[in-house]
Amino acid sequence: MALNVAPVRDTKWLTLEVCRQYQRGTCSRSDEECKFAHPPKSCQVENGRVIACFDSLKGRCSRENCKYLHPPTHLKTQLEINGRNNLIQQKTAAAMLAQQMQFMFPGTPLHPVPTFPVGPTIGTNAAISFAPYLAPVTPGVGLVPTEVLPTTPVIVPGSPPVTVPGSTATQKLLRTDKLEVCREFQRGNCARGETDCRFAHPADSTMIDTNDNTVTVCMDYIKGRCMREKCKYFHPPAHLQAKIKAAQHQANQAAVAAQAAAAAATVMTQSTAKALKRPLEATVDLAFPPGALHPLPKRQALEKSNGASTVFNPSVLHYQQALTSAQLQQHTAFIPTVPMMHSATSATVSAATTPATSVPFAATATANQIILK
């Protein structure tokens, strides 16, 4: 079985971090000296990063105002190294995926995967660098299409147990104590003032979180009790304070609503479970279809003092006969029945106490036993 996976164009290895000092207009290094990118205004900057022009690396970009960065020589060398490592990583992942697909079909021979020299930008996956056979492939950007990769872990000989994460990552919880920094302010060309812009204008760049370009708000300052001389948190103006308070109020209301919904769901579940429960007084009637058994009539008052009518009560016999007939309908086994008298007299009771020798067939049974011996 042959599996051909086409390489996917990945822009991650073309991404460069933008110099924050250059964005503020205070970088003393030139474009050829700074280790970060100095993009012109025509380039598209997202989250403090810029994508380099692939055609510029090949020397064939003919755009007048290219929205991608044309890197200088030292950054171009770094991007070329990243590109070679990314190509090796793509080939390795494609070969491993092909062999894992072959392993899923029995009878297909398992060939070792050739190893490649791994650069520092590929990652820290030890299975790629030394494993002579397969290792679990984790879906990643720029390796192979995510719809081709299996969504469940594939068990392969010689590979450590690894759980493949899902395609949808968990979303980060909204933080009410953070504000996004104005990018125009970082570039030094924000036309709005600090009291008019909806984004933060921090005076100190050290309080900016470089991961998401946000600042943490000083909650003590909002409550009017910050006594620090040099606070490391951002002190927002009045309009941003109102925005933070509104966000906190909305988050509290959402939490209360979620708790109320959870409590209502719990009560509903308990009431439904109680309604579905069977009563504890289980009777014999549950084992038979409706109408199979007649209700047991009330017992008649005793007329005789010897208690014979209590033993041979016709109503009790009627109920027992109905119960026996219902059992015969459900089971195919033959159950012999003994005829019972509907009433009993004193003579009958006295006859029951007669010794076994008075019975006609008793002597015959004894004689048969003697012959068998």
Swiss-Prot record:
InterPro entries: Znf-CCCH_Muscleblind-like, Znf_CCCH. A zinc finger (C3H1-type) spans 13-41, 47-73, 176-204, 212-238. Its main location: nucleus. GO terms for cellular component: cytoplasm; nucleoplasm. SMART domains: ZnF_C3H1. One of its GO terms (molecular function) is zinc ion binding. It comes from the Eukaryota. Pfam families: zf-CCCH, zf-CCCH_10. GO terms for biological process: mRNA processing; regulation of alternative mRNA splicing, via spliceosome; regulation of RNA splicing; RNA splicing. The keyword Metal-binding applies. Expressed in the cerebellum, pineal gland and skeletal muscle. In the pineal gland, expressed in pinealocytes, not in perivascular spaces (at protein level). Keywords: Cytoplasm, Metal-binding, mRNA processing, mRNA splicing, Nucleus, Repeat, RNA-binding, Zinc, Zinc-finger. It is found in: Nucleus; Cytoplasm. Induction: Exhibits night/day variations with a 9-fold increased expression at night in the pineal gland (at protein level). A light pulse of 1 hour is sufficient to decrease mRNA levels. Up-regulation is due to a large degree to the release of norepinephrine from nerve terminals in the pineal gland and cAMP signaling pathway. Mediates pre-mRNA alternative splicing regulation. Acts either as activator or repressor of splicing on specific pre-mRNA targets. Inhibits cardiac troponin-T (TNNT2) pre-mRNA exon inclusion but induces insulin receptor (IR) pre-mRNA exon inclusion in muscle. Antagonizes the alternative splicing activity pattern of CELF proteins. RNA-binding protein that binds to 5'ACACCC-3' core sequence, termed zipcode, within the 3'UTR of ITGA3. Binds to CUG triplet repeat expansion in myotonic dystrophy muscle cells by sequestering the target RNAs. Belongs to the muscleblind family. Interacts with ITGA3. This is Muscleblind-like protein 2. The gene is Mbnl2.
